[in-house]
Amino acid sequence: MWKGPSRTNQNYQIKYAVSDGWGDPIQINRRPTSKMSFSNYEKEQLKESIGILTIAFTLALSNGLIPVMNEPSILLTELPLAFAAVMTGFLLHELAHKWMAQQYGCWAEYRGNKNGLYFALMMSVFGFLLAAPGAVMVSGNISNRQHGIIAAVGPLTNIAIAIV
């Protein structure tokens, strides 16, 4: 899959680019590594997803926008709960996928899905939530078994959190 370093520079490039869900191609300029690393773009995507999901969860926990407008003090209790839910249920889930993929030497980065995030925000206004915030994009030469393990580790993380 790797072209190797070019003669003009020593950056490694992959043969193809994958869509990031926002309409931009993802440029890969380094070899995959088992060390957990984050690009600046990935950090921005995670921050935006966490922010929008926190607002959406806050509204859903408050039974929609109307109760929040009638009693803004609801936010004092619901916002911290929503943030904790997003950090444990969403962020740890996505980081588990990323960590496992990188353990297999794959390139792995989270990409947000604007449509899924805005849909979640729109639905939360009415007091319920359906979220498809994004996914960890994985690229590398792995077996079907390894791919299955990468896919399973996110939900297993959520199950472990629920047990605790």
What role is predicted for each listed range?
Residues 1-164:
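Hydrophobic transmembrane alpha-helices and their immediate loop junctions
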